[in-house]
Regions:
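Catalytic-core helical/loop segments in enzymes performing group transfer/polymerization on anionic/lipid-linked
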Residues: 1-603
């Protein structure tokens, strides 16, 4: 990439670029964008273009990953190591992570990328963007720029990249009808949680154990098991998903409620304390000090939700002051109510057991480290991600038991069904970028477009991730690959998609193991630039492909039943990375939970 340009254009999408294209010199200008469509358009013109959020060397970004996550761990402690955010003696600064995590990493990523511009030679920077952060950071560097304001010709500004802010707002800051549904659920849970302890005293014999369980995929069958055991009371945040009403009535819920106005004064006192007592600094590998900017992000995000945090925390404290809980079962160190409840339990010396939610592969993070006992699935994850710490046990993923019971697929190599498990932006890794899923998809579909032209026959399915936008994919296919007949699927369970699959291609995903368990040859197409542990390090038994030409050859090898796929179809090989595949993971975890409760030896 050259360093000398006439002008630099920073543009969100191709639609915006079309509004300013008359000012663009293909030979001498540089375009920076988030959008796959614009990057491809400029490349096809022969111009200079890069992803705005992907300008920095991979190793340099990885070095900064470690630095930002050290700060992420420490930011809420004062100079003496005390949590600034403490209420009724319960420290709860840890609970804010999800509130600002994406903003924090995104700012750092864009800061490091835009700093590269200061090393370029250019006359002017022209910007047409809705991202205020770009202007803020350029001002920090004292880099002058010119703004395009005329968007009148732009009808649809949707690009081919993941709208992370939109998605996060819909999930953790819901508004509108979705927000109404969330509030309704909270009210129902509060009323039920308040009433049932009194009903139980009249009609239900005391159970021996009360276990709070975070409801998600790894714990689904654990909830079902203990719900049917009269020795247990299963305590949840809300009614378990996808259960019938009869089973829901066996569950007990945390009564979280009260008047949020009662916590405004405490909120203001804590924010003042935060301003005066914050201590830790974030200095990046190049010496840049972004502490103040990051603290502004944190304060902006936590201020609006702090009263609700306090209300929830107080509800948890009041509940545990009156009720017995013997164990907390988690799937992550995230979630508003779950994390706060766990923090109160920690304060009260109540143990916790965490079953990781999917494979943990990035060693710079500390997610899922905070529990009394941890199930890492496999020895590989225990040794690499958890550094072989003593409270981690390789007990397998209960979800994988399903695959031991299913008959393996009969692979059709004449007219195969090829499923592509869509890629996705990793908002927590500096080395990820928002257009990666479309970079990934273009490469693979380009390979199959070439194969079709050569007379190969196949069916194509794209399995969109749960956080993906299916309409984006359909538009992408129509624009670039209308020669291919492709089915897009978003809501059908993965196992049902895999049952009709002969060849599976995906990113670093547990679904590659799920496919292999069904006898399906798999490919890890590494378009991502993240540094991950085995088997996704391009140095394992997993067939790993880096470019379109090799993808074409991988398909021919699949057709020829080449032995390169055999190793990763071997359950003993897979078990190194994913844990036991013997169908006994559920009972292995349940037995471990019984041992914790009975205070038996865990060896």
């Amino acid at each position: 990439m050259k360093k000398n340009y006439n002008n630099i254009f920073i543009v969100d999408t191709k639609a915006y670029f079309d509004a300013m294209v008359l000012y663009y010199d293909v030979q001498n200008d540089l375009v920076l964008t988030y959008d796959f469509a614009l990057k491809k358009y400029v490349e096809d013109l022969g111009g200079n273009v890069q992803y705005l959020d992907h300008l920095v060397d991979i190793d340099k970004m990885q070095e900064n990953n470690y630095l930002i996550y050290k700060f992420f761990t420490d930011w809420h402690y004062d100079k003496d190591g005390n949590d600034i955010f403490t209420f009724k003696d319960v420290p709860f600064g840890f609970s804010f992570r999800l509130d600002f995590w994406n903003d924090f990493v995104f700012y750092t990523r864009i800061f490091l990328s835009l700093k590269c511009i200061s090393r370029y030679s250019f006359q002017d920077i022209y910007i047409l963007s809705d991202e205020k952060l770009i202007f803020q950071i350029l001002d920090t560097f004292d880099i002058k720029y010119k703004i395009f304001y005329d968007k009148s010709s732009v009808i649809d500004n949707t690009g081919y990249y993941f709208p992370i802010a939109k998605w996060l707002d819909s999930k953790i800051r819901p508004i509108g009808f979705r927000g109404f549904l969330y509030k309704t659920r909270e009210k129902v849970s509060f009323i039920y949680g308040k009433i049932m302890p009194f009903v139980d005293k009249l009609f239900k014999p005391n159970s021996k154990y009360t276990v709070f369980i975070q409801d998600y995929h790894p714990t689904k069958r654990i909830i079902q098991h203990f719900r049917n055991d009269n020795n247990f009371t299963v305590l949840l945040e809300h009614f378990s998903r996808f259960s019938n009403k009869k089973d829901n009535l066996k569950e007990r819920l945390l009564p979280i409620g009260g008047d949020i106005k009662n916590y405004e004064q405490i909120k203001n006192e804590l924010l003042k304390k935060f301003e005066s007592n914050r201590f830790h600094r974030l200095i990046l590998s190049d010496g840049s000090d972004i502490t103040d900017a990051i603290y502004d992000i944190i304060k902006n995000r936590i201020s609006s939700g702090l009263s609700k945090k306090l209300l929830t925390l107080d509800s948890c404290i009041k509940y545990l002051d009156k009720n017995k809980v013997d164990l907390v079962i988690l799937i992550a160190n995230m979630g508003h109510t779950v994390t706060l409840f766990d923090l109160v339990c920690k304060y009260k010396k109540i143990p916790s057991y965490l079953i990781i939610n999917g494979m943990l592969l990035n060693n710079y993070q500390d997610e899922a480290h905070y529990a009394t006992y941890i199930n890492s699935y496999s020895n590989s994850i225990k040794e690499n991600y958890f550094r072989d710490i003593k409270n981690v046990y390789a007990l397998g993923d209960p979800r994988m038991d399903t695959y031991s019971l299913i008959e393996k697929n009969k692979i059709n190599r004449e007219m195969p069904t090829i499923t592509i498990g869509a890629s996705g932006f990793n908002s927590t890794d500096l080395n990820s970028y928002v257009a990666v899923e479309f970079d990934f998809l273009y490469d693979i579909l380009k390979a199959f477009s070439v194969l079709k032209q050569k007379g190969e026959k196949f069916k194509l399915i794209i399995k969109v991730r749960p956080n993906g936008y299916e309409k984006q994919y359909q538009s992408f296919i129509n624009e670039y690959f209308n020669d291919l007949k492709i089915e897009t699927i978003s809501t059908i369970p993965m196992i049902e998609v895999l049952k009709k699959t002969d060849f599976y291609i995906s990113i670093y995903s547990q679904t590659l193991f799920e496919a292999s368990c069904l006898g399906i040859p798999v490919v890890y197409y590494k378009k991502d630039t993240e540094i991950t542990n085995k088997p996704f390090d391009n140095n394992s038994e997993l067939v790993t492909i880096l470019n379109t030409d090799d993808m074409i050859q991988a398909f021919y090898d699949f057709k020829a039943n080449n032995q390169r796929y055999e190793l990763f179809l071997n359950s003993k090989v897979m078990e190194q990375y994913i844990g036991f595949l013997d169908g006994n993971n559920l009972m292995r975890n349940i037995d471990f939970i019984y041992k914790i409760l009975r205070k038996e030896s865990l060896k």
